[in-house]
Swiss-Prot record:
Function: Cadherins are calcium-dependent cell adhesion proteins. They preferentially interact with themselves in a homophilic manner in connecting cells; cadherins may thus contribute to the sorting of heterogeneous cell types.
Residue span, Cadherin domain: 54-159, 160-268, 269-383, 384-486, 487-608
Organism encoding this protein: Gallus gallus (Chicken)
Any one annotated GO CC term: catenin complex
The protein, known as: Cadherin-6
GO molecular function, one term: calcium ion binding
Amino acid sequence: MRTYHCFWLLFWAGQPHQSFLTLLSKRTSGFPEKEKVLVLSGNSRRDLSRSKRSWMWNQFFLLEEYTGTDYQYVGKLHSDQDKGDGSLKYILSGDGAGDLFIINENTGDIQATKRLDREEKPVYILRAQAINRRTGRPVEPESEFIIKIHDINDNEPMFTKDVYNASIPEMSDVGTFVVQVTATDADDPTYGNSAKVVYSILQGQPYFSVESETGIIKTALLNMDRENREQYQVVIQAKDMGGQMGGLSGTTTVNITLTDVNDNPPRFPQSTYQFRAPESTPPDSPIGRIKANDADVDENAEIEYSITEGDGYDMFGITTDKDTQEGIITVKKALDFENKNLYILKVEATNTHVDPRFLYLGPFKDSATIRIQVEDVDEPPVFSRPAYIIEVKEDVPINSVIGTVTAQDPDAAKNPVKYSVDRHTDMDRVFNINSGNGSIFTSKTLDRETLLWHNITVIAAEINNPKQSSRVPVFIKVLDVNDNAPEFAMFYETFVCENAKAEQLIQTLSAVDKDDSYSGHQFSFSIAPEAASSSNFTLQDNRDNTAGIFTRKIRYNRHEMSTYLLPVVISDNDYPIQSSTETVTIRVCACDHRGKMLSCNAEALIHPTGLSTGALIAILLCIIILLVTVVLFAALRRQRKKEPLIISKEDIRDNIVSYNDEGGGEEDTQAFDIGTLRNPEAIDDNKLRRDIVPETLFMPRRTATARDNTDVRDFINQRLKENDTDPAAPPYDSLATYAYEGNGSVAESLSSLESVTTDGDQDYDYLSDWGPRFKKLADMYGSMDSDKDS
């Protein structure tokens, strides 16, 4: 418990005959007794001076956190004018007056009503005054005094963070800085050791230590390995009172993580790996994966794989999967089981990031042996060449062998192979192949001038397994032979003037040859022997593949000979020599003195257009036939006369229209016959439905001839009654009223002709008197009457 003692504070009046106020206060034991005298004049202060009717006091000290049941006594105000008769009244104002601090207005005793906390407010400034109770006037000037709250150790140290997080590299040296923790104490640092904090470690030894005054945490153990332990939890205590017994304390937690360094080399879990790869594996295809283990993480665990040696150094490669840190073994070149079926490689795994500080731990790499077994697969035949080029002369006979392709089964079984030509590449079937030995031969004649290159594809397939096949292109070049005679470069037709002179050039000739000539074409020109002696012209070979035609005589007469045909023989210089005879047409024309053509005969005028005589005759015949056809067609059209629509103004025509009237249903196959109505005697039997077999057959009876004056309605009612009594069919037919067009015609309706009278007393001869318009009707009914009579 806390004990309290008294100390005296005196306030003196500085002049005689003046009253003075004495302020008394208690003091706590343990503090030396002190006495201060302050002289205040009015509201101002001056140390060790006197002033009329002034307050004299010292500052008060009050302990915080008072726990007693009574009010805590602070001090006492007293004036020398107070005679104890209750005439004076003491008033207190300022910080906490009336709330935290109260004063007995009669005695001047000051008390604290609540627990005070220095950490909330360390100093209170109050004002005191004594007044006359009766008049209310102050008997002393108002002055201030101070109450200071004395601190006690009632606050424990508080860390700035509840939890600290820190990290350091593994394998750090002893004394490596980790983190600094800080704790604060709310007590008065200037009073005693209440706010003096000392740090200590409660948990985390022997790995870490803390400096007692600064709170700096350092490593205390050498070579802490993250792979053994990564997380550490350290508890730090902060205690006030300089760490002495009885001081208050607080704790915090520090989570320390060891970060990784590259202190572990990669290691293969096994020294030898076995893989199998079919020989059909395409290049750049993976065949397996290997992985070296590294206890480090992140970039310190990154590994680069490489093939260092082995007989498959050029056949295989290895790459690193950056996500899984695995080595992917791939095929670089095509494998061949028959050539080599086992490869042995040495693979090395190396860290890409190496810390020089830990090189003493050994080389940061490891190696392993890889055995790759190549598996045999059924492969297609392989040709001896990737492509074949064959040259053949165009005059080679049919069925001649021009070349051979060869393919073999690369497998150990050496299956036999058959050959064929892909007909999509040889649609004309110019070539064929021996399926057994691959000999290619011609099946048709070749012509270099038609097609120089033939590109075909030959297929080689295993006989036992035709699906195993391969293809090879065969390029066949047709070589030229001299099988084409030279010919004129164009059609030559020229003219000669009647007044031409001898040895005059009238035309220059040139020739072409479809064949190739390795030494160049050399053509020779001459007049055919049979025409050389009688020719009116001469031919001069220019020795440059051209020739000139010259006149042999002076003057030509077109009336005697209008056209000359000059046969020219053209020969080449290749072997065998080819020659041809071409004809030059020469027209005789009239010319002026300068040699310009004025006129020729009709044929000569036509021919320059480029058309032959036969072509002109064919064109003329076509024109004549076309003209004759047009004339005949026009004549026939004019002879055809169209019947007039109306003969006269009184010509009135009625059209007989045929109507298909429904009413009997779809199964009623017996159509309504208007002819029967006109000729009642034609009704000679009873018509039954064709699609229904009647249950009771009855003999058809002959319908009686209609009586005189029987109209169409009576006849229809009779037929309707017969159909209604048919026991084998429902009543499909019903009475229908038929309307006939033609009302208003002078001849009235056709039905009236039949219904007015019977056949017995009706005479249709009067129809002939109605004119040509009723001739057809009169013929119809007139012939009917004649039939009756017969």
